[in-house]
Amino acid sequence: MDMKSGHSSPVMTDSPPISNSRLTIRQNRLPYSSAAATAISQNNNLLLTVPRKKTGILDDVKSNGWLDAMKSSSPPPTILNKDNLSNDATDMTYREWMQLKYPSALTSFEKIMSFAKGKRIALFLDYDGTLSPIVEEPDCAYMSSAMRSAVQNVAKYFPTAIISGRSRDKVYEFVNLSELYYAGSHGMDIMSPAGESLNHEHSRTVSVYEQGKDVNLFQPASEFLPMIDKVLCSLIESTKDIKGVKVEDNKFCISVHYRNVEEKNWTLVAQCVDDVIRTYPKLRLTHGRKVLEIRPVIDWDKGKAVTFLLESLGLNNCEDVLPIYVGDDRTDEDAFKVLRDGPNHGYGILVSAVPKDSNAFYSLRDPSEVMEFLKSLVTWKRSMG
């Protein structure tokens, strides 16, 4: 499809405090502060130097709140009755949160589309927790055929990209739609559809023959691959005796899942990770939904990936463009913030069944509501003629 000319309109209360005495993550492994980090000139100004700090944070997790953060990183599932209605007393709190702060993108759909009229929509979607449910086994996070059909249909009318923390190859395997843009490793591995281009102003954009076709790739962290491969092997070896742990290779980052690890062994998981990466100052440790992630220290995130893709589509800094980003994870907040505060004004839509603070404008409860939203976009576009 013509991504440039064919679209006339186109917990997070995340973490209570945990003490370092209970979980001894060394302070020099805590990630950089974006305010304190300084870019150095080489490598397209992407590599950052990381000042050593006496105290620090693991992303937005206070350094004295590690174990509690691990406990609260994935809320328990809401129990539904036979009519799929929540029996949880906190459901009232959720409805109040939705009504007062983050209105449903479904009930607000007409309002969103009134703003979209005459604009070209660009759509960005997270994968896990957005297009597929969060599952116990990461390798089994399959999207339904109905969801795949919804994504395929919406991509007929709007340029569409999947931006995931997974490796690009893995998320492509799950989605299996060649007409999309894919950004794996939290946006550090971007691939265009066949016949479409990426922003060639960046020196790291290359053309390759992959998956039976010519595609363009942008990989701002490519020089980190040997280091990440080495750390991956070490993490697999050091955690092999911890029952339930899974080390996932996401190419430009590594995920250590502890969702299936007994809680009494969580500190052991974290200590194993720290023991491996303590000698790698160019890597940082972040925290997600029952997962520890190791990433390169570069000035790149999902928000910058959105801007890069908009540039590639010829849609950057255009008043007649409406970017929409749908995601459920804290890493999606960088994209929400770009659309809220940056020149590419658009709408972030948070997927969450629990109240949390966000940079998003709207909310959806779960992947089933995401699918309904995508179908509504298609219906709206078709009605416009």
UniProtKB/Swiss-Prot annotation:
SUPFAM superfamilies: HAD-like
Tissues and organs where the protein is expressed, per its UniProt entry: Expressed in flowers.
Sorted UniProt keywords: Hydrolase, Stress response
Entry's Gene Ontology BP terms: trehalose biosynthetic process
InterPro entries: HAD-like_sf, HAD-SF_hydro_IIB, HAD_sf, OTSB-like, Trehalose_PPase
UniProt enzyme class: hydrolase
UniProt name for this protein: Trehalose-phosphate phosphatase A
